[in-house]
């Protein structure tokens, strides 16, 4: 008898629960295990070398405990920083979540794309490579939102978020900068 595939979904907080929901719809027979590194949240503020070490340590413990057939990283920050290292370090397959720059470049009508992400994801070489490879013909407005992930966690936990705080975090990516405004915005938190 074949056993059900065991998939570990990992994120720094509750944001990856949307990944679990999508996986549940596509793979209803899979055993899904969700792990959030809330002790390390938010990842966007960490120094890169320290964050890679933390992710490796946490992932080693999770893989030993869960013994997954596959790991899905539901965090753009962790994926853009540590996905290659995780794939080298562990035998289990890893699937990352990275900013959806390729589909955004295909969908834009104005040629202007906004990327709303953590400061780390915005400045990462991985993100720049995605832009260079898939959106070279577009104007890409990057905005590293300092507090967006934290505001999302508060809301996901049932808390209240002041709309003014949210607007302050997201409005820079919607501002017109020397031409047409972004008609497609990518979320990369």
What are the residue ranges of the model-derived segments?
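Non-catalytic structural scaffold of enzyme domains
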Residues: 1-188
